[in-house]
A protein has these predicted regions:
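Serine-hydrolase catalytic core recognition
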Residues: 23-224
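Beta-propeller fold detector
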Residues: 10-17, 58-64
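C-terminal closing repeat unit and adjoining cap/tail of repeat-based domains
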Residues: 2-5, 33
Length: 224
């Protein structure tokens, strides 16, 4: 929370909101420091929070019912290093007792375009059909998206598009190096611009993937 101070300065204070979550402003009061926030994460369904920004207090008002058992699951945010040395953050959701021997079936996804920010979100299907059964899920924040501002987006435009594909491959290589998974156990998925990403990865780095799910892709870029 940023507060104006005398002399044109601003002070800031952190709110104790959940880590590794997507926070959105639902509504505010023009005549007070009160607001309602939406909090969404990989393991917790969307919840409504009341915030008194002046007092710095938070209260969870209500939460949608859970659709899968998140007990024993955890979320980490890690970084891979792309070909040009840029650090590429990614989220991984997995069981607490994961074996670091490359045996965990893993789904890796990303978008990487149009300033779209890929942030934590609750997916009943992913949780029930994949995470509950021992799989890991990875969301990569590659360049081309809007997660870290205009420069992050512009770093993957036009003649710099290859950086996006290098970023995605770097995340896969990092997962394999950390032994979360292995090429035979690593599947990738993406749609639309993410489908184009999958098509490129399938052709450029086929040795990294055990399965590729290409959804509504833009593949014929010469006539697009």
């Amino acid at each position: 929370v940023y507060t104006p101070e005398p002399g044109g300065r601003w002070s800031r204070r952190a709110l104790a909101l959940p880590d590794n979550a997507t926070i959105g402003i639902v509504d505010t009061d023009l005549h007070s420091d009160q607001a309602f926030l939406d909090v969404d994460s990989f393991l917790t369904p969307s919840s409504l929070w009341y915030a008194d920004l002046g007092a710095g207090t938070l209260e969870k008002v209500k939460t949608l019912p859970p659709k899968f058992d998140a007990a024993g699951l955890r979320v980490e945010q890690l970084e891979a290093v792309s070909r040009d040395g840029t650090k590429i953050p990614y989220f991984i959701v997995h069981r607490n007792e994961i074996k670091l021997d490359g045996s965990t079936p893993t789904i890796l996804t990303a978008y990487g375009g149009f300033q779209v920010s890929e942030t934590p979100y609750y997916s009943a299907a992913t949780g029930k059909l994949w995470l509950e059964r021992g799989g890991a899920f990875v969301l990569a924040n590659i360049r081309g998206g809007g997660e870290f501002g205009p420069a992050w987006h512009e770093a993957g435009l036009k003649t710099k598009r290859q950086r996006i594909y290098d970023d995605f491959a770097a995340v896969a290589e990092d997962l394999i190096a950390r032994q979360y998974t292995s090429p035979a156990r690593l599947g990738i998925r993406g749609g639309s611009n993410g489908g184009l990403l999958m098509g490129v990865e399938f052709n450029q780095r086929p040795e990294l993937w055990g399965a590729v799910d290409i959804e509504v892709p833009l593949l014929d870029m010469m006539r697009y």
